[in-house]
Amino acid sequence: MPISLRLATFNVENLDDKPGELPLLADRIAVMRPQLTRLRADVLCLQEVNGQERTGQPRTLLALEKLIQGTPYETYHVSHTVTTGGEAYDVRNLVVLSRFLITASQQIKNTLAPKPRYRKVTAIPAESDAEDIGWERPILYVTLDLGENRTLHLINVHLKSKIPSDISGQKINQYTWRTVAGWAEGYFISSMKRVGQALEVRILIDRIFVSSQKIMVNTN
């Protein structure tokens, strides 16, 4: 029997609750909570959710908990990216909030597509050896139980931005490059990270199709 789903994705742009940081979390919540509520999403994918720390406890997503408080999402199943220590990353976590049970969760980062090696040609001092170029954040892959023996495969991904990656000796300050060539190489490396991770997503999708006997794709 067909099922109707509302899936939504939302980049919350470094959602955090740092003291004195503007705009204040309360001000952001006043704007964002009504927007998220209006989505009425069965499954909500979020990007750039920062983690917060409490003394003696693992880093968690406290700012997100405050954002969804009092909304239907407060009772949803949750999966998010974690460090090797099992706690949320300090910045830019991926999160899935689901009305349906999350049956499995997996992080993928240079697992299906190994890190390429590259020697920067504009670095100061010059690099003599190639170095690994890895993705900046993982892919979050979850499966959801839709009932009646149906599984939804969901991939939440936040690709590298087009902002040039740093090149040793080529930055005067955070916003100023020493040479256009240095800027161009930084842009190239960012492109390498972005396209490489997109390749890893494509490989993952192909593996899902191979491993599952019955796959339905809805493009609506």
Spans of model-derived segments:
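Structured beta-strand-rich core segments of catalytic domains in phosphoester-bond hydrolases
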Residues: G56-P164
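A solvent-exposed, charged loop/short amphipathic helix patch at secondary-structure junctions
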Residues: S165-S191
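Metal-dependent active-site segment of extracytoplasmic phospho-/sulfohydrolases and closely related
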Residues: F209-N220
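N-terminal, active-site-proximal structural segment of metallo-dependent hydrolase catalytic domains
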Residues: M1-L94, Q174-T179, K193, A198-R202, ...
